[in-house]
UniProtKB/Swiss-Prot annotation:
Bias kind Low complexity: ranges: 543-558
Extracellular topological segments: 29-188, 245-295, 341-361, 427-440
Assembly notes: Homodimer in the absence of bound ligand. Peptide hormone binding leads to dissociation of the homodimer.
PANTHER family, alphabetized: PARATHYROID HORMONE_PARATHYROID HORMONE-RELATED PEPTIDE RECEPTOR, PDF RECEPTOR-LIKE PROTEIN-RELATED
Gene that specifies this protein: PTH1R
Alphabetized InterPro entries for the sequence: GPCR_2, GPCR_2-like_7TM, GPCR_2_extracell_dom_sf, GPCR_2_extracellular_dom, GPCR_2_parathyroid_rcpt, GPCR_2_secretin-like, GPCR_2_secretin-like_CS
A biological process term (GO) from this entry: intracellular calcium ion homeostasis
TM annotation in the entry: 189-209, 224-244, 296-316, 320-340, 362-382, 406-426, 441-461
Important for interaction with G proteins (motif): residue ranges: 475-478
UniProt keyword terms in alphabetical order: Cell membrane, Disulfide bond, G-protein coupled receptor, Glycoprotein, Membrane, Phosphoprotein, Receptor, Signal, Transducer, Transmembrane, Transmembrane helix
Name listed for the protein in its UniProt record: Parathyroid hormone/parathyroid hormone-related peptide receptor
Family annotation (Pfam families): 7tm_2, HRM
Signal peptide as annotated in the record: 1-28
Length: 594
């Protein structure tokens, strides 16, 4: 009872961080292209233009601000830039200003310099600090850009040059020193490329195995095959998306956008028609990636719902629920992805569509979030049932360590199936592309996200006893067939025992029993007649060997499998006709998990 009361509270506590950082999870695989950077820069320019228009339409506010700004003159002393430490001589206006009075100057008007939207500037050499814009991917978003406003209400110029002075050194530090950052990204790319490749290969083999053996065709394995296929399509869509995005100019290339290039881009934007045509392939790739990403989450949820139904439903019709699970896993993600595509194409048809566009991202993120929360709650509840079952089976025994080991093993087996690793760093959103915590988080997520399909294929296919039994049986049949073919190529043989000569082909030396397969002579018992060995392919009428073979009843054939109890899928697709079948179904699930 104590465990039952604690589990809901624990699930609620662990699910709260999931709701608080959904954006970080779903956008983890996005990349920034040069075209997307251009789009963000133009959008920032448009927003700045609106703000400038609002400010310029209120001259009274500027004059009121003008009255409040005063600064003391420091004639005869050079000024030092607070940001860069460079010394600049005083202007002639500052030298002429009286030293025994306070001078009221005009503020510098806000303006767009093709990178930043500068606010009103205080006069008399005051340095204006503005945070580095977050819409420029390569900038250091913790730094600041600096400008200085003179007493005439003009932004200070660079000495000897006819352009406004600005200090972007803190913002562009990632552009000038990116060797270590590139090593981190290259390592992350290698990790998830290897992981998704191994997952794709192992899942392909697993699907072929489950599809080839007819005795493995059952609802449980059909659901496994759908889950495997969703992992495979997710991996393929990621590879395709990366190929499309990286085929053009991206911000992960060696040549990055410099400050001058950003200004040139903002001054001469590309034609909208050309930009839209160039985004077609990218948008299709991103759309399929988001769809297969969503289907993967929902088939993980289907696995949890299926196992949960076997545990808590007394009468569970698997055939009927399989169709519902199929529609749920493939159809529901198609609905909200189609809605998202329609909204993006209608209201925000800009960029490559892998960027968030206001609140429209929640059309996809909320359903994915809901699936993560649900299958984590199912995981907690199933682990609770496992703990209860182990406690009941271990009642009266003193070895509690074995009980805990079984529970730990069962939990570890269920973790990759339910994607429990998703919630480890859910409370840590992507706020910066640097730092030790960010590197730990990215390595963890890239490792487990890419290798999750590989772990699922190993646990639920290659380590499954039923699958191993079918493979061993097929291997035995294949080696037996090779043995007969090898002996058949040796031709007919003559065997002489006393007055009788038997010319027998080796392909007919054994009777067909059991599963209808021919048996090798060395596998059959050798009978004797009058002290002479009796060949399997020849026996005198009335001999014990012949009588034994002739009177062998059909009941000696392989017994019919009875479903989960014997580790087979036969009989799983029948409707539940009595209270005995659900425990049989559940027994196989316990064998897989335990």
């Amino acid at each position: 009872m104590g465990t039952a009361r604690i589990a809901p509270g624990l699930a609620l506590l662990l699910c709260c961080p999931v709701l608080s950082s959904a954006y970080a999870l779903v956008d983890a695989d996005d990349v920034m292209t040069k075209e997307e950077q251009i789009f963000l820069l133009h959008r920032a320019q448009a927003q700045c233009g609106k703000r400038l228009k609002e400010v310029l339409q209120r001259p009274a506010d500027i004059m009121e601000s003008d009255k409040g700004w005063t600064s003391a003159s420091t004639s005869g002393k050079p000024r030092k830039d607070k940001a860069s430490g460079k010394l600049y001589p005083e202007s002639e206006e500052d030298k002429e200003a009286p030293t025994d009075s306070r001078y009221r100057g005009r503020p510098c008007l806000p303006e767009w310099d093709h990178i930043l939207c500068w606010p009103l500037g205080a006069p008399q050499g005051e340095v204006v600090a503005v945070p580095c814009p977050d819409y420029i991917y390569d900038f250091n978003h913790k730094g600041h850009a600096y400008r200085r406003c003179d007493r005439n209400g003009s932004w200070e110029l660079v000495p000897g040059h006819n352009r406004t002075w600005a200090n972007y050194s803190e913002c562009v530090q990632f552009l000038t020193n990116e060797t270590r950052e590139r090593e981190v990204f290259d390592r992350l790319g290698m990790i998830y490329t290897v992981g998704y490749s191994m997952s794709l290969a192992s899942l392909t083999v697993a699907v072929l195995i489950l599809a080839y053996f007819r005795r493995l065709h059952c609802t449980r394995n059909y659901i496994h095959m759908h889950l495997f296929l969703s992992f495979m399509l997710r991996a393929v869509s990621i590879f395709v998306k990366d190929a499309v995005l990286y085929s053009g100019a991206t911000l992960d290339e060696a040549e990055r956008l410099t400050e001058e290039e950003l200004r040139a881009i903002a001054q001469a934007p590309p034609p909208p028609a050309t930009a839209a045509a160039g985004y077609a392939g990218c948008r299709v790739a991103v759309t399929f990636f988001l769809y297969f990403l969503a289907t993967n989450y929902y088939w993980i949820l289907v696995e949890g719902l299926y196992l949960h139904s076997l545990i808590f439903m007394a009468f569970f019709s698997e055939k009927k629920y399989l169709w519902g699970f199929t529609v749920f896993g493939w159809g529901l993600p198609a609905v909200f992805v189609a809605v998202w595509v329609s909204v993006r194409a209608t209201l925000a048809n800009t960029g490559c569509w892998d960027l968030s566009s206001g609140n429209k991202k929640w059309i996809i993120q909320v359903p994915i979030l809901a699936s993560i929360v649900l299958h984590f709650i199912l995981f907690i509840n199933i682990v609770r049932v496992l703990a209860t079952k182990l406690r009941e089976t271990n009642a009266g025994r003193c070895d509690t360590r074995q009980q805990y080991r079984k529970l730990l093993k069962s939990t570890l087996v269920l973790m990759p199936l339910f994607g429990v690793h998703y919630i480890v760093f859910m409370a840590t959103p992507y706020t910066e592309v640097s730092g030790t915590l960010w590197q730990v988080q990215m390595h963890y997520e890239m490792l487990f996200n890419s290798f999750q399909g590989f772990f699922v294929a190993i646990i639920y296919c290659f380590c499954n006893g039923e699958v191993q039994a079918e493979i061993k049986k097929s291997w035995s049949r294949w080696t037996l067939a090779l043995d007969f073919k090898r002996k058949a190529r040796s031709g007919s043989s003559s065997y002489s025992y006393g007055p009788m000569v038997s010319h027998t082909s080796v392909t007919n030396v054994g009777p067909r029993v059991g599963l209808g397969l021919p048996l090798s002579p060395r596998l059959l018992p050798t009978a004797t007649t009058n002290g002479h060995p009796q060949l399997p392919g020849h026996a005198k009428p009335g001999t014990p060997a012949l009588e034994t073979l002739e009177t062998t009843p059909p009941a000696t054939a392989a017994p019919k499998d009875d479903g989960f109890l014997n580790g087979s899928c036969s009989g799983l697709d029948e409707e539940a006709s009595g209270p005995e079948q659900p425990p049989a179904l559940l027994q196989e699930e316990w064998e897989t998990v335990m």
